[in-house]
Curated annotation (Swiss-Prot):
This is Signal recognition particle SEC65 subunit. It comes from the Eukaryota. GO terms for molecular function: 7S RNA binding. Belongs to the SRP19 family. Signal-recognition-particle assembly has a crucial role in targeting secretory proteins to the rough endoplasmic reticulum membrane. It must be involved intimately in the translocation of a wide variety of protein substrates. The gene is SEC65.
Amino acid sequence: MPKLEEIDDLEDIDNLHMDLAELDASLKTPIAPRLKPTVVRSQDSEPPLFPQIPLEGEQGPSFTFIDPKSGRVEETTKITKEDLADLKRFQILYPCYFDKNRTHAQGRQVPLELAVANPLAKTIADACRELEVLCVFEGEKTHPQDFGNPGRVRVLLKENGKAAGKYANKRWLMKNVAKYLQEHPTTLESLREIPYGPDFEGIEPSKIPLVHGFQMNEIVPLHSPFTMGHPMTKGIYTAPKVVAPEKQIKAPKNKYKVVRR
């Protein structure tokens, strides 16, 4: 006589200790490898906004050197970590140090009688070359209080604890640089002497409109975020076109003639 066996609920298929997705449908192995979830972001599949500009991390730090003899700006050169450590011995000059429209709290470091309007880092580099001071021009670096005027200059004043040139301290050098800036005021033509990338070819320099209550210069390099030539902000001053709404045609009123009898 056949026997009836009771099946415990623990042996139900819904109480397995393994995921059903781990079962190998091909029956070649008892258990298939567990699938690892992957996160795919939509922005990873999109093309870069500016493909000609390398992403951060794909290129090392680069600097532009000024030839002390000819005064010409050499091509941008990538620097190794060893060279970068040597550059830390250089002191830094920012354009806002010489800006007459700024107070000392806003970044000015020279006396007001020596300050100038619209100072540029390229002119500061020209002054250091004229003063026979070893300098490095960094066109992309900015001061936190003057982010709209990119560019700074590294100068070597001391070597092994001794003066590297005739200027023993930074204050003395800045005084002579300020005199050079006064003799060479900034104009729109000065912007053509700054090295730019291919994105700025054909862009004519122009003064930017000043914003009331905001500290800024009217003559800044073309790659400044304040200019209309910058790829990211070139349309910031363009007023959007106002589209006039279409006139709605009113439906004619129904007129009734009342006839009295």
